[in-house]
Amino acid sequence: MGKGHEMKATSGVQGTLAPERLVGGLPTMYCFETCPFCFKVKALLGSRGIEYSKVEVDPTFKTQLKWSDWGKVPIYVDQDGTQVNDSNHILHYIDQKNGNLFPRAGEDMDQDHWMDFSNNVLGKSIVAVIYTTYWTSVGALDYVTRVDNFSRTSRLINKWVGAIIMRMVGKSRAKMFDLPPRENLQHQLDEMSKGIQGKFFGGLGPNGADFANYGILRSMQGLNGFDLVEGHAVISGWYN
């Protein structure tokens, strides 16, 4: 779907195919390396053993998304050119085509609730913790200095200017909750643990809520605040 298209881009499966956006003829995901929502999709693709290509998107300028009206990551382009926008929609699309092992949206209220929780609560909670200071923000964005398809200038801008931007984003996310960032994340992990039915949200096997929330927390690994995940009585066991 090009920039000149009159229809406003939406989440979910798009009506126009984009086969020219495939890399190496494989399903292709457009993503940021540390994006929590991209890690959801990576988790499911890895679990199903699906080979795919990845296009690393410049987080400041998003040059690699100029072709799409949808300016957010992740974007998933399947082998036939089908474009799917938004992480939870991508999870449902991939599962439906590869095993159909968990319910579709609207078929399981608990799964829907916890998948929404991953976007609306957990994803925002971890951003407030990761980007709590300028220097934790710089640390989280250090990966951009190692991305081959970014120019040297782009790498520097994304690391140093991007850290300022993400610190501001972290502040705005923190204001969404009553508790300070670390205490809030601890509280949300406690809340999340109530939805785990045995080993998984899905009971005996993982469902969409497992992949959605695991992906969010996986993006924190090695960054500020992950100790809360590792130290949680319920979530640490579920995560591992």
Description of each model-found segment:
Residues 236-240:
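Intrinsically disordered, low-complexity polar regions and short flexible loop motifs
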Residues 123-234:
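GST-like fold's C-terminal all-alpha helical module
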